[in-house]
A protein has these predicted regions:
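Conserved beta-strand edge residues that scaffold enzyme active sites
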Residues: 16, 55-56, 215, 251
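Extracellular glycoside hydrolase catalytic/binding regions
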Residues: 70-94, 98-251, 256-296
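An active-site-proximal structural segment forming one wall of the substrate-binding cleft
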Residues: 1-9, 13-14, 20-97, 127-138
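N-terminal carbohydrate-binding accessory modules
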Residues: 1-9, 24, 153, 288-299
Length: 300
């Protein structure tokens, strides 16, 4: 990762379910393993982003037949299980409060394009200690030195219509997942969407990170020459000082590291290539564009 991609940051999705189970039963095997992996990454010189994940990929049980889509007391218990003095005194470890919150699913509030930011911050009373700001403020007390990362809501888990709420912890950043970065196959429309979802927030002086991104299936036919993709990676993000991590990087097999997305495939075998498999035979390689950009940045 460091040698072939010139990466300086790695993001790990944590299993809220596993950590919470250990918290409730006095166990530590999973938390110990995670700490060991973090130590290896830090020894390699990488900044580490830890993201609390409560989706099915993280072995976290459903609540009321559905996914947990806002952090709550269970999220706090999971963080408490993992955090120790080494992590909370390491400023090279960033804590992403909760992965991909959705108030429409957690609270039946707002819409996908117009999130309810009050519920995002404070929850809707359905669970104890619910809400991104609620849990974020609790997490700040546990980890006063780490950067806290707050993910948005709605399209691209962005920040359309967002106003920073009162009481947001200091030393915080904001994260997005801009998978829907190509809009109607048009660069001007795409730039407008980027501005609305995260660019304006970055331009106002707030730190923004795209903590997941890949080219995805839907964008191959809509960006035939990868004009939008190149502009997004090579010009827009740098001009707004927005960092990016890909989803997801895997270790080398027959070549120096790939972007893979294998959770939709049966068995344990990932399809190793630079972008998601595409039934239309698209040969785009946005991963290579990103890799080249990382290399160029490293030279500078």
């Amino acid at each position: 990762m460091v040698k072939d991609w010139h990466a300086n940051t790695v993001r790990f999705n944590l299993s809220q379910g596993a950590l919470q189970y250990e918290y409730a039963h006095g166990l530590s095997a999973y938390a110990d393993m995670v700490r060991n992996v973090i130590e290896q990454a830090r020894s390699a010189g990488l900044i580490v982003i830890l993201s609390m994940q409560a989706e099915r990929y993280s072995c976290t049980p459903y609540e009321d037949g559905g996914l947990q889509k806002l952090p709550d007391l269970r999220t706090e218990q999971a963080w408490k299980q993992l955090l120790d003095s080494r992590l909370t005194h390491d400023k090279g470890v960033m804590l992403e409060v909760f992965n991909e919150p959705a108030t429409t699913r957690a609270c039946d509030d707002g819409t996908f394009r117009h999130p309810d930011w009050k519920s995002w911050a404070h929850g809707c009373g359905r669970e104890p200690d619910q809400g991104m700001l609620t849990v974020g403020r609790w997490l700040r007390k546990q980890a006063p030195e780490n950067v806290l990362v707050f993910m948005g809501d709605g399209v691209d888990f962005g920040f359309s219509g967002f106003t920073v709420p009162h009481g947001m912890p200091s030393n915080s950043a904001y994260s997005v997942h801009p998978y829907q970065y190509v809009v109607r196959g048009n660069l001007i429309d795409s730039i407008h969407a980027w501005n609305t979802r995260f660019g304006n927030l970055a331009a106002s002086g707030h730190a923004v990170i795209a903590t997941e991104w890949d080219e995805g299936l839907k964008h191959c036919p809509n960006d035939p020459n990868q004009t939008i993709t190149r502009y997004f990676i090579q010009r827009y993000l740098p001009s707004h000082t927005i960092g990016i991590t890909v989803y997801g990087w895997d270790a080398p097999v027959h070549a120096p590291g790939y972007i893979v997305n294998s959770y939709n495939y049966p068995g344990n075998a990932a399809t190793y290539q630079f972008v998601d498999p595409n039934s239309d035979g698209c040969v785009h390689d946005a991963g290579r564009i990103l890799q080249e950009t990382f290399r160029a940045d490293a030279v500078q």
